[in-house]
């Protein structure tokens, strides 16, 4: 060994430098490379055979033993019994699971059908509502256009409407208007609206009887007759159906007391008052006041006279209500006791 080493050294020292080969190192040679390890797969010679799946509905053998449920199986027959019981339990559980899944699928199918029908119905309703909405929008636009045209168009001049008493400007005062009281109409209701049987002629007659006593004029109609109160002339006819009398004026009173005079009536009676010289010795008891009052108990026939409308009581009053009570004097009595009968 030592001899070989010495010979190599001598040979190297004896050779020239030019004869020695140049050693070069590439970068690829300096890189580290992992050694390739080949993994050898160990194949086990003893492999278990694959478990063969038994077909569905295979008849199971009848167990030879009758092992209680909670007892451990020890023998091969007992283990076979446990296997058969396990297979039966699995078959029952699988059947129950399949039935449950079938019911769930049927329920889902029914719900799907119902949802499809409801979706179809809602789509139809949506189309109907859209059509209705479009129709209403068109109608609204048409009405808006009509209202706008009616506002822009000027009204045609027509016949002037009659002024209504309830719509006159005098009844509704506007802001900033000063309305005097004399311009506001205050209608006075007629007295015939409150009394259904009271006539204007009877009202005027009753007022004239109390204010101007009747004067008996002899020789006109006969002895003891009184001058008619409303004898205003021979050309005036009293119609019961159209008896609308006005209050008597001074000229009417002049014609009343001077009815037989064709010339201008004498106003001395009105100016000087009633003359008591026409009576015998100025006795008022001799004046026939009873002839001027109708004491007839029969009611006055008011047929043909239009009653007042809108009043509940339309029965005429009887003249018997004007008769004095039993024991009262029928002659004129005053507070001074002028009449003899008082």
UniProtKB/Swiss-Prot annotation:
Organism from which the protein derives: Aspergillus fumigatus (strain ATCC MYA-4609 / CBS 101355 / FGSC A1100 / Af293)
Record function comment: Master transcriptional regulator of the unfolded protein response (UPR) that recognizes and binds to the UPR element (UPRE) in the promoter of UPR-regulated genes. In the canonical UPR pathway, the ireA RNase splices the cytoplasmic mRNA hacA, which alters the reading frame to allow translation of the bZIP transcription factor hacA. Induces the expression of pmrA, scrA and spfA in response to UPR.
Start-end of Polar residues biased regions: 315-330
Source domain of life: Eukaryota
Region (Leucine-zipper): 136-143
Ranges for region Disordered: 1-105, 146-167, 306-330
Region (Basic motif): 82-135
Gene Ontology molecular-function annotations: DNA binding; DNA-binding transcription factor activity, RNA polymerase II-specific
Major location (coarse): nucleus
Protein's recorded name: Transcriptional regulator of the unfolded protein response hacA
Biased composition (Basic and acidic residues): 35-48, 74-88
UniProt xrefs under Pfam families: bZIP_2
Knockout or disruption consequences: Leads to reduced capacity for protease secretion and impairs growth when challenged to assimilate nutrients from complex substrates. In addition, exhibits increased susceptibility to antifungal agents that disrupt the membrane or cell wall and shows attenuated virulence in multiple mouse models of invasive aspergillosis. Affects the expression of only a small amount of genes. Leads to hypersensitivity to agents that block calcineurin-dependent signaling. Impairs the UPR-dependent induction of spfA.
Family listed: Belongs to the bZIP family.
Gene3D superfamilies reported in the protein's UniProt record: 1.20.5.170
UniProt-listed SMART domains: BRLZ (SM00338)
């Amino acid at each position: 060994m030592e001899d070989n080493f010495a010979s190599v050294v001598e040979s190297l020292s004896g050779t020239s430098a030019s004869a020695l080969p140049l050693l070069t190192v590439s970068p690829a040679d300096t890189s580290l490379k992992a050694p390739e390890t080949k993994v050898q797969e160990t194949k086990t010679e003893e492999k278990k055979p694959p478990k063969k799946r038994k077909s569905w509905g295979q008849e199971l053998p009848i167990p030879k033993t009758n092992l209680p449920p909670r007892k451990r199986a020890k023998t091969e027959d007992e283990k076979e019994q446990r296997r058969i019981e396990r297979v039966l339990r699995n078959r029952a559980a699988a059947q129950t699971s399949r039935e449950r899944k079938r019911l769930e699928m049927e329920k889902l199918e029914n719900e799907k059908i119902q949802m499809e029908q409801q979706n179809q119905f809602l789509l139809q309703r949506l189309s109907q509502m859209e059509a209705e909405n479009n129709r209403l929008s068109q109608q609204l636009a048409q009405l808006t256009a009509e209202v706008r045209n009616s506002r822009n168009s000027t009204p045609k001049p027509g016949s002037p409407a009659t002024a209504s008493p309830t719509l006159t400007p005098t009844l509704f005062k506007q802001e900033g208007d000063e309305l005097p009281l004399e311009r506001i109409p205050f209608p006075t209701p007629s007295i015939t609206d409150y009394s259904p049987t009271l006539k204007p002629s009877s009202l005027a007659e009753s007022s004239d009887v109390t204010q101007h006593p009747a004067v008996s004029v002899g020789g006109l109609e006969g002895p003891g007759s009184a001058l008619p109160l409303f004898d205003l002339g021979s050309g005036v006819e009293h119609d019961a159906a159209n008896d609308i009398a006005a209050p008597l004026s001074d000229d009417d009173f002049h014609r009343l007391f001077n009815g037989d005079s064709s010339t201008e009536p004498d106003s001395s009676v009105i100016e000087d008052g009633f003359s008591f010289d026409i009576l015998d010795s100025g006795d008022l008891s001799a004046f026939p006041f009873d002839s001027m009052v109708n004491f007839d108990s029969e009611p006055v026939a008011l047929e043909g006279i239009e009653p007042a409308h809108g009043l509940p009581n339309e029965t005429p009053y009887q003249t018997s209500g004007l008769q004095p009570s039993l024991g009262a004097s029928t002659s004129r009595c005053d507070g001074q006791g002028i009449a003899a009968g008082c």
